[in-house]
Amino acid sequence: MKILILFGSPKTNGSTAKLTGAFMKGIRKSDDVEIVHLFSLQPTPCNACGYCKAANGCSKKDLEKFMAKLEDADAVIVATPVYNLSFPAPMKALFDRFQRYYEAHFRRKIAQPITKHKKALLLVTAGDDEDDGYNIIEKQVKLSFSVMNTELVGGVLAKDTDNGGVKEDDLRRAFEL
């Protein structure tokens, strides 16, 4: 199974990394896993140029290799902290660039812009003790993935990480996904 992890935290050893690490310990050794660090990838933001309204892809070519990996994956893991009730900027820029699939589906009437069905999971960390950020991110992911032949099937919210980091129960739940 090809698993693509979209890692949205700037901290490679913070709470999101710990939650992602617990998930990775729970997957099969035979799985092919790639972690894409979005703060390193630095997706160029969408500027509404309209290219994807009429053609496949995007006028910006910085994500072509990434999009090919995404389309080929069997599973997509969105691992992100909550920033102001949403994603950090590079994750948001990436999700905005998924507009190419929205336009293909709704404007150009391509039933499944991504032919390979895939499953997705959310691994979300939040410094506070609220569910609001997770709920907003979950809705954004579900709606974006709905035109990408990708089904969100579960997730873990590790909240209150500003007070003691990721809890053992959250690590266990990520491992068991």
Q: Residue locations for each model-derived region?
A:
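N-terminal beta1-alpha1-beta2 submodule of the flavodoxin-like/Rossmannoid cofactor-binding fold
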Residues: M1-T80, L85-E103, G154, D160-L177
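Short, glycine-/small-residue-rich phosphate/pyrophosphate-handling segment
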Residues: R107-E151
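A short, flexible beta-alpha/helix-coil linker loop
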Residues: A126-D129, K159-N163
